């Protein structure tokens, strides 16, 4: 009688016992009258020794990635043949029976880490790519993370509830994926971009602690690392302040990292206002794993002879500077030219520089710095081999452009510690931003966020100055999640709709069902949504979220595996009252 086990169950207690393993052939080596087979399953690897003449005939047919069943006796290997790179390297199975469960065609790429296969091949044969150890472990970690989330939140009295995936189309920035209704001719469902409205309705229902590991859908233009469908942890709570969300998420993420990676994070994350983040890091999602802080030098250049900077200051602009200590030798003229071109992408008027040699400014705009030389040297402790970069522009443009220069320089100088996880809360965001193209205000995050109390009475007088009860969670320079305390009265929600250009009739048409619900005793409530895919990408040091999604789409929102999206027969279209026009016209 053979005991069926997995590869990871091999141990000393099974020596000389008869075992059975069902697994895949990772490697097979023929040595005359002996064949060695390395088996792999989800759990581990094991070596099989075949020396029986009848079985050798079977092994002569076996190739890599065949799925086979092996029965045999577990033995210790000779001490000089122990493979210390395998956990089971001290054991081998002396084969008594071998059955080929199924054969494997010629492989499109080798099933090994760092196999250099192109992305489309890996996606087309995703079921093979998932056999690679590195890739497999990422998907297993995903399961562990979602399991930890469910356990933690359930113990905190949260209800895991499922909101609809066929919803009314209420575009929130990106385009909706639309699903035509066969029953309701000419009408369409949308796939949700987020469960936002429904989780708020859940709070109005009195179900005060909700979470969902939610599938979300956005029909966005193709761009490197976007996926048309993605997963987020969605949380909403009643009768709370943002502090409650901060504490909950800090404890949850601490538990996730401890349980899955055995990493102890700080129990309290850093906090920073939006204004400070922009001024100091040039980003509302700053990477704080390295210092390289942006300086505001506007007040010094009021005395400068450099008219370009003086004119910008007179027009209420700003001068942002980045000081790179003891690295001037690493910035050749060609490298500086590249940085100047990079700055132009962000619509700034230019990137300027000056190096320090022999206790003097040299190169770039050095000749315009003589009047303020001593002030800058003393204020910033400047020394030889330092280099300063300057951007002069409107506040927002200068901050964002210098923030991108900061990131590029940090990458080029390898300043980032890849093995650390720096979490950060950003809060006090503007509630609205002005769109120069439409000449209208739009929600900076979304339309359901509560303005801070001091702005509510004067909301319409200067929307660009209004701050919201809005917060983002940032990890290693990436936005991991976003949340807010929500509007909970119809009157205030209607005012916000009006500010962003939704007149009463449009608001009623799109959101009437939600506005009506706000008239039935809505509680104070708020929440957050965390990108599961992005969290896992960072946890696994992956370069793409595709690596942590079981069956992802490619960069063009298509699936090489099943060839989705695909055309459908005309009879299906007729049932839906649809016709396809020639897209070329």
UniProtKB/Swiss-Prot annotation:
<dbReference type="GO" id="GO:0050560">
    <property type="term" value="F:aspartate-tRNA(Asn) ligase activity"/>
</dbReference>
<keyword id="KW-0963">Cytoplasm</keyword>
<feature type="binding site">
    <location>
        <position position="227"/>
    </location>
    <ligand>
        <name>ATP</name>
    </ligand>
</feature>
<feature type="site" description="Important for tRNA non-discrimination">
    <location>
        <position position="31"/>
    </location>
</feature>
<dbReference type="GO" id="GO:0004815">
    <property type="term" value="F:aspartate-tRNA ligase activity"/>
</dbReference>
<dbReference type="InterPro" id="IPR012340">
    <property type="entry name" value="NA-bd_OB-fold"/>
</dbReference>
<feature type="binding site">
    <location>
        <position position="479"/>
    </location>
    <ligand>
        <name>ATP</name>
    </ligand>
</feature>
<protein>
    <recommendedName>
        <fullName>Aspartate--tRNA(Asp/Asn) ligase</fullName>
        <ecNumber>6.1.1.23</ecNumber>
    </recommendedName>
</protein>
<keyword id="KW-0030">Aminoacyl-tRNA synthetase</keyword>
<dbReference type="InterPro" id="IPR047089">
    <property type="entry name" value="Asp-tRNA-ligase_1_N"/>
</dbReference>
<dbReference type="InterPro" id="IPR002312">
    <property type="entry name" value="Asp/Asn-tRNA-synth_IIb"/>
</dbReference>
<comment type="function">
    <text>Aspartyl-tRNA synthetase with relaxed tRNA specificity since it is able to aspartylate not only its cognate tRNA(Asp) but also tRNA(Asn). Reaction proceeds in two steps: L-aspartate is first activated by ATP to form Asp-AMP and then transferred to the acceptor end of tRNA(Asp/Asn).</text>
</comment>
<dbReference type="InterPro" id="IPR004365">
    <property type="entry name" value="NA-bd_OB_tRNA"/>
</dbReference>
<dbReference type="InterPro" id="IPR029351">
    <property type="entry name" value="GAD_dom"/>
</dbReference>
<keyword id="KW-0067">ATP-binding</keyword>
<keyword id="KW-0547">Nucleotide-binding</keyword>
<dbReference type="GO" id="GO:0003676">
    <property type="term" value="F:nucleic acid binding"/>
</dbReference>
<dbReference type="InterPro" id="IPR006195">
    <property type="entry name" value="aa-tRNA-synth_II"/>
</dbReference>
<dbReference type="Pfam" id="PF01336">
    <property type="entry name" value="tRNA_anti-codon"/>
</dbReference>
<dbReference type="Pfam" id="PF00152">
    <property type="entry name" value="tRNA-synt_2"/>
</dbReference>
<feature type="binding site">
    <location>
        <position position="218"/>
    </location>
    <ligand>
        <name>L-aspartate</name>
    </ligand>
</feature>
<dbReference type="Pfam" id="PF02938">
    <property type="entry name" value="GAD"/>
</dbReference>
<feature type="binding site">
    <location>
        <position position="445"/>
    </location>
    <ligand>
        <name>L-aspartate</name>
    </ligand>
</feature>
<comment type="similarity">
    <text>Belongs to the class-II aminoacyl-tRNA synthetase family. Type 1 subfamily.</text>
</comment>
<comment type="subunit">
    <text>Homodimer.</text>
</comment>
<dbReference type="InterPro" id="IPR004115">
    <property type="entry name" value="GAD-like_sf"/>
</dbReference>
<keyword id="KW-0436">Ligase</keyword>
<dbReference type="InterPro" id="IPR047090">
    <property type="entry name" value="AspRS_core"/>
</dbReference>
<dbReference type="InterPro" id="IPR045864">
    <property type="entry name" value="aa-tRNA-synth_II/BPL/LPL"/>
</dbReference>
<feature type="region of interest" description="Aspartate">
    <location>
        <begin position="196"/>
        <end position="199"/>
    </location>
</feature>
<dbReference type="GO" id="GO:0005737">
    <property type="term" value="C:cytoplasm"/>
</dbReference>
<feature type="binding site">
    <location>
        <begin position="218"/>
        <end position="220"/>
    </location>
    <ligand>
        <name>ATP</name>
    </ligand>
</feature>
<feature type="binding site">
    <location>
        <position position="486"/>
    </location>
    <ligand>
        <name>L-aspartate</name>
    </ligand>
</feature>
<feature type="binding site">
    <location>
        <position position="172"/>
    </location>
    <ligand>
        <name>L-aspartate</name>
    </ligand>
</feature>
<dbReference type="InterPro" id="IPR004364">
    <property type="entry name" value="Aa-tRNA-synt_II"/>
</dbReference>
<dbReference type="GO" id="GO:0006422">
    <property type="term" value="P:aspartyl-tRNA aminoacylation"/>
</dbReference>
<dbReference type="GO" id="GO:0005524">
    <property type="term" value="F:ATP binding"/>
</dbReference>
<dbReference type="InterPro" id="IPR004524">
    <property type="entry name" value="Asp-tRNA-ligase_1"/>
</dbReference>
<keyword id="KW-0648">Protein biosynthesis</keyword>
<feature type="binding site">
    <location>
        <begin position="531"/>
        <end position="534"/>
    </location>
    <ligand>
        <name>ATP</name>
    </ligand>
</feature>
């Amino acid at each position: 009688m053979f005991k069926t086990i997995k590869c990871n169950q091999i141990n000393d207690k099974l020596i000389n016992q008869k075992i059975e393993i069902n697994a895949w052939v990772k490697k097979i080596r023929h040595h005359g009258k002996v064949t060695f087979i390395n088996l792999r399953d989800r759990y581990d690897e094991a070596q099989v020794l075949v020396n029986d003449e009848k079985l050798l005939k079977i092994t002569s047919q076996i190739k890599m990635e065949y799925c086979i069943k092996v029965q045999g006796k577990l033995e210790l290997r000779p001490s000089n043949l122990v493979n210390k790179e395998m956990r089971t390297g001290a054991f081998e199975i002396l084969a008594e029976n071998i059955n080929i469960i199924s054969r494997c065609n010629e492989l499109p790429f080798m099933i090994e880490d760092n196999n250099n296969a192109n992305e489309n091949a890996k996606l087309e044969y995703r079921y093979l790519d998932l056999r690679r150890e590195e890739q497999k472990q990422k998907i297993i970690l995903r399961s562990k993370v979602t399991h930890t989330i469910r356990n933690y939140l359930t113990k905190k009295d949260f209800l895991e509830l499922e909101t609809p995936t066929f919803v009314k189309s209420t575009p929130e920035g990106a385009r909706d994926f639309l699903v035509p209704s066969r029953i309701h001719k000419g009408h369409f469902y949308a796939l949700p971009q987020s469960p936002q409205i429904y989780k708020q309705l859940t709070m109005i229902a009195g179900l005060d602690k909700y979470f969902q590991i939610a599938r979300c859908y956005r029909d966005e233009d193709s761009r490197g690392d976007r996926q048309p469908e993605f997963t987020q942890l969605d949380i909403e709570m009643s009768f709370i302040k943002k502090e409650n969300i901060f504490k909950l998420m800090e404890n949850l993420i601490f538990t996730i990292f401890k349980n899955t990676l055995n990493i102890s994070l700080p129990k309290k994350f850093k906090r920073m206002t939006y204004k400070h983040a922009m001024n100091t890091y040039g980003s509302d999602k700053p990477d704080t794993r390295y210092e390289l802080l942006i300086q505001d030098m506007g007040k010094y250049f009021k005395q400068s002879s450099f008219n370009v900077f003086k004119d910008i200051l007179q027009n209420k602009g700003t001068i942002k500077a980045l000081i790179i200590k003891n690295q001037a030798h690493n910035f050749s003229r060609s490298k500086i030219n590249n940085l100047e071109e990079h700055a132009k992408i962000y619509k700034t008027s230019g990137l300027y520089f000056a190096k320090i040699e022999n206790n003097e400014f040299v190169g770039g705009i050095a000749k315009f710095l003589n009047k303020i030389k001593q002030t800058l040297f003393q204020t910033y402790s400047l020394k030889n081999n330092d280099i300063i970069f300057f951007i002069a522009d409107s506040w927002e443009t200068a901050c964002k452009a210098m923030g991108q220069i900061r990131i590029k320089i940090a990458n080029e100088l390898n300043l980032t510690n890849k093995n650390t996880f720096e979490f950060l809360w950003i809060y006090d965001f503007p509630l609205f931003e002005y769109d120069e193209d439409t000449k209208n205000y739009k929600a900076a995050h979304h339309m359901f966020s509560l303005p801070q109390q001091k702005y509510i009475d004067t909301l319409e007088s200067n929307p660009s100055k209004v701050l919201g009860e809005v917060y983002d969670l940032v990890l290693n320079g990436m936005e991991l999640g976003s949340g807010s305390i929500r509007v909970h009265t119809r009157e205030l929600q209607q005012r916000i709709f009006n500010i962003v250009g939704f007149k009463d009739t449009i608001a009623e048409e799109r959101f009437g069902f939600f506005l009506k619900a706000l008239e039935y005793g809505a509680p104070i409530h708020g929440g957050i949504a965390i990108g599961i895919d992005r969290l896992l990408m960072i946890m696994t040091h992956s370069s793409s979220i595709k690596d942590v999604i079981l069956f992802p789409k490619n960069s063009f929102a298509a699936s090489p595996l099943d060839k989705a999206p695909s055309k459908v027969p005309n009879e299906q279209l007729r049932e839906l009252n649809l016709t396809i026009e020639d897209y070329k016209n």
